[in-house]
Amino acid sequence: MPDALVAWLRDVEELRSLPQRYARAIDARDIDGLALLFHPDGVVDGMRGSSPVPAYIDGLRDAKRVFESSMHVLGDPLISHEPGSATAHLDTYAVVHQLDKVDGSGGDATLGVRYLDDVVQRGGRWVIRHRQARILWHRASAG
């Protein structure tokens, strides 16, 4: 197999794992681990508006928990990446389960989310430079 093809396949596999690493970090509330997945000069456009990555990470660190736990279940990302390029785009669907509201009501929520990520190579690894997180649907249940 030519070296260029092997390098591209390695990149695609690393890109495929990026949303999974995000899901595991956010569900575990591993904010330091989460920060490593983003470019420090990046931007996140999400449920709370648009934020530079440092402000987004600080907001997550300071946020009060609403639910006891969450689980992101991801579809396989659609990856756009040209061989040899240091940029790529990921389009990932997710179903996010949020369980047991901390206010004691026991309510749960389930969301359909679409993550659109522009990613770049930085320091030999892929990181998210611009994320758009779009809620496609939301369902809440009482406890």
Where are these regions (language model features)?
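Short beta-strand edge/turn micro-motifs at domain boundaries
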Residues: 87-89, 112-143
